[in-house]
Amino acid sequence: MHWGVGLVSSRSCVVDLSRNQTLSLCWCWGSEENYSFYGDIVAFPLQDYGGVMSGLGSDSWWKKTLYLTGGALLAAAAYLLHELLAIRKEQEVNSKDAIILHQFSRPNNGVPSLSPFCLKIETYLRMADLPYQNYFDGKLSPQGKMPWIEYNHTRVSGTEFIIDFLEEKLGVNLNKHLNPHQRAVSRAVTKMVEEHFYWTLAYCQWVENLDETQKMLNITGPLSDLLKWILCHLTKGIVKREMYGQGIGRFSEEEIYRLMEKDMRSLAGLLGDKKYLMGPKFSTLDATVFGHIANALWGTQGTYKEEGIAGELINLAMYCERIRRKFWPEWHDDNDNTTYESDDSGEDSRTHTPFQDFSYYSRTGTFEDDGMDNSISQTPDTDFTGHSLFDSDVDMDEFTDHDQCK
């Protein structure tokens, strides 16, 4: 009796590793990433192998070798699927009066997330000063989305709906200072970033620079390199198909980067010399734009986008640096002077400090009492006293963040 091994999922995903050990995948994927895969490994008998094998002869030494090799391949396929699809027992999460944020695991390049949407919503929670707990379980929401939250046993997915839910339940509002015109501009820019610029970023990460992205994935254990390769190439195929359906994927690489540059120049023009996109106070739009531009700046180092932001669009780079230092004090980039990098500094000189993660986060409770003096290092953007050139932007607001959120 010969058996095939495959994966059955309720989320429009079928992986077949039976007869020719090939991998086929069909997945419904949108602009908010669905990079995790779940399902059940099943085995099923193959009825038509008898005639084929009888034609090959019997009692041959290579026949036994074929059996052993086939069994080993099936066992390896089952193991790889188990590791790749992260099949595990569902953990019980107590979300009573607590925000549980489900997102992808931290990459190993020092950036909090390679997902612009995960970075967006986590930055929003920090801007709103809402304590939350991270869960890097890779589990998608019931709608197949990532990130998603649980609060008082209610599950909400989609960053826009998450923010609406938190505003309604907790009374926070980062946009209360915006007039109707500014709110309209904010929504239009949000859609440009999430529905247009996002796809150029995905192209850069998962198509054009796939090898570099593969190095950033935080996968450990046996066959980790093979698992990274499989996951990256699966994601590349998904991204290319989704980009083609969206329309951007029908253009050449040069045309895609031209569209990306237009979006970045539009953002740089909107920002101008302001502290935040809508003026002196941060808003939800800043969390959205930061999630995407920060990934382009620190998550794609050495690429066209990173060089364009750090070089010509200097105000966008300084804007991201301000937000990073204000709301991500534990995010240390050893190449902290990205914007002012010298010509002789190469990729080999870049190192990354592992992201210092906390199981529970509250900006006021975790960091304000600790003080930031110990975390200041001498870089080209600090003066001889050790104070950052960005301190005037960070510490001398005419209002408190707490008052803005209420």
From Swiss-Prot:
It holds the Pfam family GST_C_6. GO terms for cellular component: membrane. InterPro entries: FAX/IsoI-like, FAXC_N, Glutathione-S-Trfase_C_sf, Metaxin_GST, Mito_Protein_Transport_Metaxin, Thioredoxin-like_fold, Thioredoxin-like_sf. Its main location: membrane. It is a single-pass membrane protein. It comes from the Eukaryota. Keywords: Membrane, Transmembrane, Transmembrane helix. Residues 335-357, 369-389 are annotated as: Disordered. Coiled coil: none annotated. It is found in: Membrane. The chain crosses the membrane at residues 65-81. SUPFAM superfamilies: GST C-terminal domain-like (SSF47616), Thioredoxin-like (SSF52833). Belongs to the FAX family. May play a role in axonal development. PANTHER family: FAILED AXON CONNECTIONS HOMOLOG, METAXIN RELATED. This is Failed axon connections homolog. It comes from Xenopus tropicalis. The lineage of its organism: Eukaryota, Metazoa, Chordata, Craniata, Vertebrata.
